[in-house]
Structure formats: structure tokens, C-alpha cells
Amino acid sequence: MAGSEPVSAEGESMAVDAAPRKPRILLAASGSVAAVKFANLCHCFSEWADVRAVSSSGSLHFIDRASMPKDVILYTDEDEWSSWKKLGDSVLHIELRKWADIMVIAPLSANTLGKIAGGLCDNLLTCIVRAWDYSKPFFVAPAMNTLMWNNPFTERHFISIDELGISLIPPVTKRLACGDYGNGAMAEPSTIYSTVRLFYESKAQQGRAVVTLR
């Protein structure tokens, strides 16, 4: 199993100190064909941050695990159950939540969007979301067919997750995997990476300014 290595929850906050560590980024993929780009996304982030990855069962149909960075562990639903044997053992979705400074779901499918908006937690990914500390940054990059994107439920669901403080990295208009042309394609991995990194470094700079003022 890819996720057999234990997770350390040490250093839950994004505190900036004299010798700052790398940011800890938890990347997650849900079951959209855009998950074919997930390995590329992990490579983008792993050059800058410590990365852990989570995949839903649906996303595994599209992720090329052989292309994943060697230093990035990919956790699956199987790991959630196999890592717990008895009372007192660590719970994977809690440990990953504690470990991460930032969570990014890319791609976010219509199905997983609906689950998050409704508070459902029936797999490793959605259990992490349900247990997430929303004082920490959380980004999603949706990917779905244009008609699914334009469905009235999608707007309602995004209103719900926006109230939690989850930030949207909007989809783009292009030829989709199904052959249709329209909005709903996931933003490019480079765009997702630059958005998250710019946010993190901006917050870190603000933190240093506060320390200096004190």
C-alpha cells in the first residue's frame, strides 16, 4: 500500500519562525477525468513543499501512480481502514488533517462537491474535509461537464462551501474530455500551484511584518 508510512501531526499551524520549514500541502483528487493531471500537480508542488496526496476510489481510474513523485505518498480509502487496528491507534483522516497547512482538491468532481456541501463523509477524502480546521486555507479546482457546471445545484453547493471558507480556483473553457466545448475544465496544474503558493507566501510575509511591528 502506498500510504503505509505514518503521518506526523507535529506543527499544525502555519507559524513563521526563524528557520521556517517547508509548507505542508495535502493534495486530493476526486473522480474526474482531470485526475489524469494529478501526478503533474504533485510534481509542481513537491518542488516547493512537503506533499501528501489523497485519492478517492474514482480518481484511481485516471491517476498514473507510476508517474507520481517518488517522495509523495498516495493515500487511498484502503489505507484509512488498514491503518487502524484497535482503540488508541491513530486515525488517518485526523492525522492528515493535523499534518497539513493547506488542503487542495484538484480535481473536484460534481459528486464530491455535492458530498462536501451536504456534510457527507463516506471516504478518506470527505472525512478529511469534514474534520478540517477551517482556520487553515482550503482550495478546490472543479472539473466537470459544462452542463454539470451550469446545473443549479452547482451554484448552491458552491455557496455552501464558500461559507466554510473554501476558496475556488475557477474552471476554464476549452474542449472537454467528453468532446463538448465549454466551461468546466480544471485549471492547469501550474495555475493551481501558483495560486496556492502566492497565497501562502503573501500570508507568510504578513506574518513576518506583524512580528517586526511587535
Curated annotation (Swiss-Prot):
Q: Needs which cofactor?
A: FMN
Output the superkingdom of the source species: Eukaryota
The record's tissue-specificity note reads: Mainly expressed in roots, to a lower extent in stems, and at low levels in leaves and seeds.
Q: Does the entry feature the keyword Flavoprotein, yes or no?
A: yes
Which Gene Ontology cellular component terms are annotated? nucleus; phosphopantothenoylcysteine decarboxylase complex; plasma membrane
What switches on expression, per the entry, is described as: Induced by salt (NaCl), lithium chloride (LiCl), sorbitol, cold and abscisic acid (ABA).
Gene Ontology BP term (one):
positive regulation of response to salt stress
Enumerate the active-site residues: H93 (proton donor), C178 (proton donor)
Q: Which reaction equation describes what this protein catalyses?
A: N-[(R)-4-phosphopantothenoyl]-L-cysteine + H(+) = (R)-4'-phosphopantetheine + CO2
Could you tell me where this protein is found in the cell?
Answer: Cell membrane; Nucleus
Q: What is its main location?
A: membrane
Query: Briefly, what is this protein's role?
Result: Involved in plant growth, and promotes salt (e.g. NaCl and LiCl) and osmotic tolerance, probably via coenzyme A (CoA) and endogenous proline accumulation. Catalyzes the decarboxylation of 4'-phosphopantothenoylcysteine to 4'-phosphopantetheine, a key step in coenzyme A biosynthesis. Favors seed germination and helps the onset of flowering. Required for roots development.
Describe its assembly: Homotrimer. Interacts with CYP2 in the plasma membrane and nucleus.
This chain belongs to which protein, by name? Phosphopantothenoylcysteine decarboxylase HAL3b
Name of the gene this protein is made from: HAL3B
